[in-house]
């Protein structure tokens, strides 16, 4: 049976390494990932986990950051991860629809 994980998050290294700096002004991120024990994965860690668990592919979801610059960087991260792991990681970009410039980021 083909197993696909339909909702995973992977994060840019700068978010994984400096999680605390991303908490202010980002209540959703703080709620889900503010606890240092909350697991965050890079693309390489995610693919290794897929391999270990026999999962064929995963839909990698960006995070709906309020800060549009951070959202762009995260979208870039998941697009690059998908390009590096074709057929394994399927990107799903995210943007806060109320953020100024959100439409341009969504179209990109």
Locate predicted features.
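Helix-coil boundary/capping segments in enzymes
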Residues: 1-108
């Amino acid at each position: 049976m083909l197993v696909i994980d339909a909702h995973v998050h992977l994060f840019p290294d700068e978010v994984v390494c400096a999680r605390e700096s991303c908490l202010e002004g980002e209540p959703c991120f703080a709620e889900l990932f503010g606890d240092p024990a909350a697991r965050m994965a890079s693309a390489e860690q995610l693919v290794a986990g897929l391999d270990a668990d026999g999962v064929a592919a995963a839909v990698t979801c960006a995070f709906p950051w309020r800060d549009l610059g951070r959202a762009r960087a995260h979208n870039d991260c998941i697009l690059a991860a998908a390009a590096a792991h074709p057929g394994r990681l399927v990107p799903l970009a995210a943007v806060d629809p109320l953020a100024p410039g959100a439409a341009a980021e969504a179209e990109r």
